[in-house]
């Protein structure tokens, strides 16, 4: 393996598998487009992962385009990208690491693809400008403090595929007044909820298909 910067993006290249991982570089900024393949020494490498902390504290990063070749987004990959307003996660991605988008305070909307089955701890914590989250029917678990301190979030839809929600998933989401749950009250009550999911929230109503539950 070796590391190389190609057209402004730093990669770790694996000559055996011919795959590439986007890795940490301090000065990513503006609008970044990650290609599906990169070439070095006449060999083509498939970009399959965004590594842990790859864009950590890149405060001037505004948007990122992730190719359909990427299957994994690492831990804290975009943490503290305070100017990041737009990101599209392709449906090739199957896992999103802990805290991957935490503290992205300018991010207003996020769509999680159906290829993902669980949302990791702290994944979108402290995204204080987040207004809209799309959680697909493929999701079975929501981690601890996943949306904590998303202070602009007023409503979120949770599919009936979800079987567990971690402690403090909506901690200090001060304006979260409505959770739209696609299942019944009985299905909601059967979800494994670790401690209190909305601590620090004045009042939240879960709207189920057959009635409401007050948290």
Question: What kind of feature is each model-predicted range?
Answer:
Residues 6-10, 15-18, 26-49, 59-72, ...:
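Structural signature of tandem-repeat unit edges
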Residues 52-54, 74-79, 97-102, 120-126, ...:
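Consensus positions within tandem repeat domains that build extended binding/scaffold surfaces
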Residues 171, 191-196:
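A structural signal for leucine-rich repeat
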Residues 198-200:
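Short mixed-charge
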């Amino acid at each position: 393996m070796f590391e190389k910067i190609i057209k402004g993006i730093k990669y770790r290249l694996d000559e055996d598998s011919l795959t590439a991982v986007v890795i940490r570089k301090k000065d990513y900024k503006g609008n970044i487009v990650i290609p599906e393949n990169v070439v070095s020494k006449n060999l083509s490498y498939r970009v399959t992962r965004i590594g842990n902390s790859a864009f950590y504290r890149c405060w001037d990063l505004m948007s990122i385009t992730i190719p359909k070749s990427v299957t994994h987004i690492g831990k804290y990959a975009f943490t503290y990208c305070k100017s990041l307003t737009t990101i599209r996660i392709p449906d090739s991605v199957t896992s999103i690491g802990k805290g991957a988008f935490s503290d992205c305070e300018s991010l207003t909307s996020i769509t999680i693809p159906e290829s993902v089955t669980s949302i990791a701890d702290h994944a979108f914590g402290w995204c204080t400008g987040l207004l809209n989250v799309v959680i697909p029917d493929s999701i079975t678990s929501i981690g601890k403090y996943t949306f904590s301190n998303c202070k602009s979030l007023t409503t979120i839809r949770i599919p009936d595929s979800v079987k567990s929600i971690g402690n403090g998933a909506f901690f200090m989401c001060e304006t979260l007044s409505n959770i739209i749950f696609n299942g019944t009250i009985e299905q909601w009550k059967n979800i494994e909820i670790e401690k209190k999911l909305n601590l620090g929230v004045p009042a939240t109503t879960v709207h189920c298909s057959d009635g409401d539950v007050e948290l």
